């Protein structure tokens, strides 16, 4: 398969996600095929957090597309992928638009000729990863980082990089999300295994790392002090620190953050291609990307600033850990099994 722009590694994995909070209304056009003029039903499968969908995305997308009924199926990336896999086998794909975290999954869908190529009118403004033919665009960029509780540790005491998590002084006090359930955690495992070898995870296992179902459990246990440090998504920590004034702090590892440019794509089986294209255009618009940043993720556009409390997107991109997306796409089951055997088996 021909590698898309982001596979070249030069593509700037900027910013962020669709898990967006405040999905403000889109511009209405006279053209019935754009923004407010589209009609019919549209089904979106996504890994965006439920509270963001219910409290912000639904009402604001409804405002952007008043004549189109937008339905949402939400779940972790792996839950959504499992659902889609069954629908593909049954030749009954119910989703029109897909917005899940793991970029490598879109490579598999493209190989299976299941995506609808669409050159968005916002194409020139997207400086993050995208397929050359428009079959997918990064719509949100998440960053896997290390976090700690500022009330429990001083900055100079906290881990500085990924290898520090294997230091015996953190034994039994570290955690990470489950790559069997989380697309972003899966990417992190693949990236770190490539950079440091699977022996890295042997060391984490020996150091008593705990694998939690999701980020919520991790952040709560960081707050209580059960965990001293943990691998977690940046947006979770930024949200708590800025909206609830919690003492959680972000560490941008000196050996590189793990950028996850999560895409948006249209299935070529959609019965509402005009509505799906309008949805893609809106998410990639400046308004849509500003909403992404309100969800504490980074934008895929160069004219939208990073979320409050974060580091300039360009700096994170320049120092990121290299990810072999094609390898992740081709070896999903093997990578997960290797992790399970080395870390999760007793």
Predicted regions and their residues:
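Short, low-complexity disordered leader/linker segments with a strong preference
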Residues: 1-41, 346
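Periplasmic-binding protein-like
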Residues: 142, 172-180, 203-204, 211-212, 246-268, 282-306, ...
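A bilobed periplasmic-binding-protein/Venus flytrap-type ligand-binding module shared by bacterial periplasmic
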Residues: 147-152, 190, 260-272, 282-283, ...
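Short beta-strand->loop
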Residues: 116-122, 135-138, 163, 246-258, ...
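A ligand-binding cleft/hinge motif common to bilobed small-molecule-binding domains
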Residues: 104-108, 228-247
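Conserved N-terminal structural module of periplasmic/extracytoplasmic solute-binding proteins
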Residues: 26-97
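Extracytoplasmic ligand-binding site segments that recognize negatively charged/polar headgroups
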Residues: 43-55, 73, 77-78, 93-227
């Amino acid at each position: 398969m021909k590698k898309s722009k982001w596979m070249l590694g030069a593509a700037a994995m900027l910013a962020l996600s669709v898990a967006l909070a405040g999905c403000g209304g889109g511009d209405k056009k006279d053209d019935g095929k754009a923004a407010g003029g589209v009609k019919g039903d549209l089904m979106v499968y996504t890994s965006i957090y439920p509270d963001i969908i219910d409290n912000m995305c639904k009402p604001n997308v409804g405002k952007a597309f008043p004549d189109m009924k937008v339905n949402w199926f939400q779940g972790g990336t792996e839950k959504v992928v499992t659902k889609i896999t069954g629908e593909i086998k049954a030749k009954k794909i119910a989703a029109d638009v897909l917005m899940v975290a793991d970029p490598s999954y879109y490579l598999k869908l493209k190989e299976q000729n299941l995506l609808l190529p669409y050159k968005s009118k916002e194409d020139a403004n997207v400086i993050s990863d995208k397929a050359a033919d428009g079959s997918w665009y990064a719509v949100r960029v998440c960053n896997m980082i290390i976090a700690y509780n500022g009330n429990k540790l001083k900055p100079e005491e906290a881990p500085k990089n990924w290898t520090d998590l294997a230091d015996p002084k953190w034994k039994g006090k570290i955690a990470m999300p489950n790559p069997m359930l989380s697309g972003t955690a899966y990417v992190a495992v693949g990236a770190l295994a490539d950079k440091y070898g699977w022996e890295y995870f042997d060391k984490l296992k020996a150091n008593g790392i705990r694998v939690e179902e999701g980020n919520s459990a991790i952040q709560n246990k960081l707050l209580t002090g059960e965990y001293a440090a943990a691998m977690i998504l940046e947006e979770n920590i930024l949200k708590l620190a800025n909206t609830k004034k919690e003492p959680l702090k972000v560490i941008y590892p000196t050996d590189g953050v793990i950028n996850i440019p999560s895409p948006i794509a249209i299935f070529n089986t959609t019965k509402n291609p005009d509505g799906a294209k309008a949805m893609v255009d809106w998410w990639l618009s400046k308004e849509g990307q500003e909403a992404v940043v309100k969800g504490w993720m980074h934008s895929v556009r160069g004219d939208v600033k990073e979320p409050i409390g974060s580091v300039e997107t360009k700096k994170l991109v320049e120092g990121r850990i290299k990810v072999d997306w094609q390898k992740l796409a081709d070896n999903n089951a093997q990578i997960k099994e290797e992790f399970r055997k080395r870390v999760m088996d007793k």
